[in-house]
UniProtKB/Swiss-Prot annotation:
Residues 8-159 form the Nudix hydrolase domain. It comes from Rhodopseudomonas palustris (strain ATCC BAA-98 / CGA009). GO terms for biological process: nucleoside phosphate metabolic process; ribose phosphate metabolic process. GO terms for molecular function: bis(5'-adenosyl)-pentaphosphatase activity; guanosine-3',5'-bis(diphosphate) 3'-diphosphatase activity. This is RNA pyrophosphohydrolase. PANTHER family: NUDIX HYDROLASE 26, CHLOROPLASTIC, UDP/ADP-SUGAR PYROPHOSPHATASE. The keyword Oxidoreductase does not apply. It is an enzyme of class 3 (hydrolase). A motif (Nudix box) lies at residues 47-68.
Amino acid sequence: MARYEDLPYRTCVGVMLINREGLVFIGRRAGGIEHVDDTHVWQMPQGGVDPGEDTWKAAKRELYEETSVNSVEKLAEVPDWLIYDIPRTVAGRAWKGRYRGQRQKWFAARFTGADSEINVVHPGGGHKAEFTSWRWEPMHNLPELIVPFKRPVYERVVKEFSQLAAAV
């Protein structure tokens, strides 16, 4: 097994889905070894980018695979790739020990559909559920709800997209 320091970052995307009231979609994670306690189980949709895939297309695909949502309009994109390391204690088990963390491109998208479109229990395309429940949350609360090692990424995403939190 490679040394932790030598492991690459997994290329991923994340989506801040914002409704008409300016609230953000968060899902309660179905589980995973990277989650440290029950108070930090909420997160926004995110996932891997396939080789050669456009990042916005990957973001829409991941959003659909995790939430069944297709009704979105792209609002903004964080200009930089944001990086986080997973704790060394779980690095050997997460992603089969192939990565030390993620390199993420984040997008903000306006949800233009009805809440009834959202289905995290039986998500689009027959994918395995990654969330057990969901809710709309004020943007400023997000960093406190995520696992601590992802918090700096969430703080940056909230800072980048804070002007989008107003209701439309």
